[in-house]
Structures are given as C-alpha cells and as structure tokens.
C-alpha cells in the first residue's frame, strides 16, 4: 500500500564549501557596457557581464525541480520534505499537505540564502545533523498512514528515500557517512519498537548520496551502484559536477517513480519576430510509464531516441493537427496520467501548456516509415491539470467480440452454444455440506463420462441435429446416458433402433432441415443412415457401463453388419480410441466392402500371411533382404572378384600397352571365338 517513493527527504549540505562557484559562467549579453577585455591565452572574448551560480544554488534549484515534477504528476499522493543542515538541522516543511507545495518550499529556501564564506571552518558544520533529522522524519506518519491506523490496519508499511546532496573528500569519508546513517537508523527503530510506539518503524530506506564538485574539478569519490548496507538500508553514490546535478536528478526520478519521457515533435508555433511565419518545435514531457505500456497492438513499437546530454530514452510522438471529429472517429481511452514538461520555463513548453489549458486537445501519433498514421495518445487539460490519455490501438473491451467464424480453420458459424450450456449444467458439481464417509467417486465418474463426446459444431454431427425432427430421439438419448438403465429402458431403445432399421430398409430419407442438409452435403439415404449408426454406436460405447448398455451395443453392431456397415471387431481398443478422437463425419477409413472380388481378397490374405511370417523384422530388414536377393541373381564385378582383399582393382589394366595386339574393327580373334564356343 505504501511504496518506497511515498516519502522522499532531501538533505541539503549548508556548509561553507557550498558557497563557492560552480565554475559555469553565464554571459549576460543583454546588459549594456563595454566588452570585457580578452583574457590572456584565450582566443575568444566574453561580451557583457558574466555570472556563475554557487554550489548551493545549483543544489536548491535541482532539488526544487525534482519536487515540482513529483507534485505535478502525483498531486497529494507522494510527499517530499527538505532539511537544511549546517550547525543543526533546519526543517523546511513537514508531511502536512499545507506545506507540500512549491510556494512554501521556495519562500523557505529564500530565507535560508547562500552559505557565507566568512563562516569559520568548524566541525559543528556537518551534514550528519540533517541525516539524523531525516531518519526521525521517516518515522513520523503521514496523513494516509494515520488514516490507515484509525481504520484498524494492523501492519502499516513505512518505507522512504533520503537524497543527500553534499561533498566529501574521498571514499573513506563517504563510507563513514553511510555507517553513521545505518547506526542512527537502527537506533531509531529501537526507539519506536513496542511498547513505546513513538512513531513508525522504518521498514526500509534508500539512501542516495550526490557528491557535488565544481565544473572541471576531479573528485576522489568514485561512483557506486546500489549496494545493500543492511537489511534496512540500501545506498548508492553519484559524483557529478554542479551544473549537471539537474540532469542527474532528472535521470534518477524516472527510476524512483517509474516515469517515462515523451517528446512531442513538429509543434507549429509562430515566431516572435515574424508573426506571419511559423516553425516546428519539440517539447519533452514526463508521465508515468504505464501510459506507454498500456498501448497495445500487433507488432507495435515506439520510436525511441536518446537526447544529447541525457542518459535515458525518450519516445517520439508526432503532433497531429487538431481537427473536428465525431465520436465514431475517437478511439477508446485505456488510461489517463498526469503530465508535466521537463523544461517548464522554455517558450515551446509554455505555449503548449497554455494551448491545452485553454480547452484544446491534441492527438499524438506514432511516426511510421510506411507513411501510415497511428494515433496512440491524446493531450488534454481538466481542472487546471494536464493529462495524457492512452488510446487503444488494438480492439477495445467495449467493442463487439470478434466473430468466432474468423478463425484460422475457416468460417464456423454453427457452434452448439446452447448444448454446451446444458452440458455444463449437467456436469456441475456442488460441494457437500458434510464430508462423506466413503470415497467420493461419483463426481469423478461423472467427470470422466460426460464430456468425452461432444461435437462442437452442428455440421460435425447427425445424431444431435435430428433431435427436433425425430420426436423419440431426445428421450432415447436421455436413456442412453442413464447410469441405472433397466430392462424396460433397454427394450424401448431396442424398439427405436429396429424402427430406424425399417425406415432405412424402406429407403426413407432422414428428416434433415434445409440448412443442415446443405451443410452436411449428404444426399444418399445409405450414407445418411451409415453415419447415423456410426455416431450412435460411438455414443453407446462411451456409456456401456451396464449389461443393458452392452446388449444395446451388440444389437446395434449386428444391425450395422446387416446393413453392410459393420465395424472392425478385431481391435476393440483402437475402435474405442477412435470413438474419442474422430467425428462420424470425418473422412472414412479404407475398409473392404462386399463389392471386393475374391481375387483381391486372396491377395490381401496372402500379403497378410507374408507380413505375419516376418516376425519382429523391421522395415529396413525387409528392404535389405529384398535387395540382397536381387543382387544375387547378377555376377559381381570381375575386378572385385579377382583383386585380393585390401588392394585396389585397376579399371583398364591394358590401357596404354603398345605391345598388345591391336584388334581390327569387325574382326574377332580365333581365341575369342573358341572361348565363346566353349561358354
């Protein structure tokens, strides 16, 4: 409920060191006067008066800018306090909402002023006083924590963050500062422990130390990432130049409060010097990161970039010219978040803020390489606050659900939704008030038996499509799923099956409706009854738990055999498995029919005998033996037969021998004739 960023305390070092210059000079060229003489050894001259901020001014301005962003984005939700430390700790504001505003903090900081350089160097001036006061301030409850305590909350979370802006000599001094802070934190938790209960116990504290040095001065303090000092304390150290402390705090605040940066580009603004012309400007704004993460869509990515001088990414969104559009053109909003500009004093930011506060809205679109436009966000103001609205790019929850017919398998417009609802009602299990003594196997039996066969679509079943046309079929199906079928129910079902057989013998068509008949595309009477019998047998097999069910199944199988559509009884387990996985309207398996002649039957039987005699031989063994039997009928290569093992046979041993007698074409030597005769 209370996160670590709920409480943030700035501890500002107000010692003599912070009165020195930051060494970043600002040229005041608008002041009239003689140019300053060119400094020796430099190739440039500075026109006008030059000013430089002190370390104290840089620290105060950047910390106040930090709290401005927090209060703009989380008004009344996140709290920031300031403590100034010199010879003692000076409390600037409290957790009270009346002091959590910019005017109170600014007026108090003006009264503190810059540290005097005439202050004598003394050990009494230390930032440790402020760190002690910061730990005590973390133990004080906020209004939200007090309300939770009054509401009866037993465990109130209390976490916080302390940002200390100081300057240390080396790593040893910084380590000593961390140890003192950790010791004081443990002592404070011991003071508020029961039974005293003087405040809240600090569950965890995040200490951020910013070591400030003037521009161009190297520090002996090294940067260090987040490190766990104790179970109650994590600390990190950053060494930055005084002019860059504002950018550093801007980078830190994005991680502290999970913020994101958005740069609105191509904002048309008129020039101050020439009102007839306009130029495009960019404005960077901050908001919660969820404003980007809630925008979803297929293959949707934001264009990000890193601005010069910063270490974080910013999302680039393009200004969309305001235009009048109806409600049909607006996308639904999936979230709204407060917005604040990064540079609140710049002219482009001021123009954008005034434009929005005057009641105008701005649409922001994602730039695409393909040239298409995708509007993802909208800026608008209400009640003096500016919000960014995340627009739904994908389908909204308020839109109609996508048609189930547009699936990857094609159009399926006839899902059996009412029948599925009835099946769910039949399969519903209600918990018992008292625990049964025996095993509760009835629910498990129902779970295994009911949903095994359920055609999802109307065009995948014949049996269930005929329930409205055949008056006896609903009652017949009800008797099939009964667990306690008696002899009378069996006789009724037998009668209905025989009546169905008589209808098939007369050649009566099954009473399909026009729509079902068009979908099923089964026009032959024999095909209709064959599919009907197959599905009926499949349903009876799943419910054959009593002798009456088994008798009914045998009767139907004999009827199918008489009709010429007998099932294969040689492998009952395979047939039982196919009853779960196949629909009666699936493509039929190749089965021998009565029209097959005796010769083809004998061939099949002979092939079966040959295959059965193979035993456990694999397909590779069968193919290898067939190749060996074929190769044994031919003589092998003479070179392989005459050459000893391990040697290579020469293909043409007499090639190139000049002494060999040259045979005349068309004349056969007598020796060859004799060999041919003897052979």
UniProtKB/Swiss-Prot annotation:
Keywords: Cell cycle, Cell division, Coiled coil, Cytoplasm, Developmental protein, Differentiation, Meiosis, Mitosis, Nucleus, Phosphoprotein, Spermatogenesis. A motif (Nuclear localization signal (NLS)) lies at residues 604-610. Residues 519-541 form a coiled coil. It is found in: Nucleus; Cytoplasm; Cytoplasm, Perinuclear region. Residues 564-610 are annotated as: Disordered. Phosphorylated. Its main location: nucleus. GO terms for cellular component: cytoplasm; INTAC complex; integrator complex; nucleus; perinuclear region of cytoplasm. InterPro entries: Cell_cycle_regulator_Mat89Bb. GO terms for biological process: cell division; centrosome localization; dorsal appendage formation; flagellated sperm motility; meiotic cell cycle; oocyte nucleus localization involved in oocyte dorsal/ventral axis specification; posterior mRNA localization involved in anterior/posterior axis specification; regulation of fertilization. It holds the Pfam family Mat89Bb. Belongs to the Integrator subunit 13 family. Component of the integrator complex, a multiprotein complex that terminates RNA polymerase II (Pol II) transcription in the promoter-proximal region of genes. The integrator complex provides a quality checkpoint during transcription elongation by driving premature transcription termination of transcripts that are unfavorably configured for transcriptional elongation: the complex terminates transcription by (1) catalyzing dephosphorylation of the C-terminal domain (CTD) of Pol II subunit Polr2A/Rbp1 and Spt5, and (2) degrading the exiting nascent RNA transcript via endonuclease activity. Belongs to the multiprotein complex Integrator, at least composed of IntS1, IntS2, IntS3, IntS4, omd/IntS5, IntS6, defl/IntS7, IntS8, IntS9, IntS10, IntS11, IntS12, asun/IntS13, IntS14 and IntS15. The core complex associates with protein phosphatase 2A subunits mts/PP2A and Pp2A-29B, to form the Integrator-PP2A (INTAC) complex. This is Protein asunder. It comes from Drosophila mojavensis. The gene is asun.
